[in-house]
Amino acid sequence: MTINEIQDEIIEEFADFDDWMDKYQLLIDLGNSQEPLDEKYKVESNLIDGCQSRVWLQADYVDGKILFTAESDALIVKGIVALLIRVLSGHTPQEILDADLYFIEQIGLKEHLSPTRSNGLLAMVKQMRMYALAFNAKG
């Protein structure tokens, strides 16, 4: 699936819920469904700066595609990073760099997050794009 196809799928899933409490529950469920991050990756260098919660992000470059794994100590943040991984993991660095992450606005996520969580979301996206830039430069 393309990045946009995945985003459209997420938009449809969130459209099934009218109440934001249900959408938060969906985020929590998504976070809990993620494979836990291997303890060896829970190191300072994998922590994302700018997040109030602790978020570890690991990126591996395999066969020209970036595979992201992550974990957070906060339930909703864990769900947010799970969404980002779902959208961006398994794509080429250039696809990630070119991606317009419109699903964030479309599902209303940005407007329903506290300012600190919103900053954390931006920090997660920035870090994923930084990995894409680095892997793109390596070719």
Region spans (language model):
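Hydrophobic (often cysteine-bearing) scaffold residues that line and stabilize catalytic clefts
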Residues: V77
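A short interface-forming secondary-structure element
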Residues: S72-D73
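General beta-strand recognition
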Residues: K65-T69
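N-terminal intrinsically disordered, cationic/polar leader segments
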Residues: I3-I11, A15-R54, Y61-G64, I104-A123, ...
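Alpha-helical support elements that line or immediately flank enzyme active sites
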Residues: V81-H91
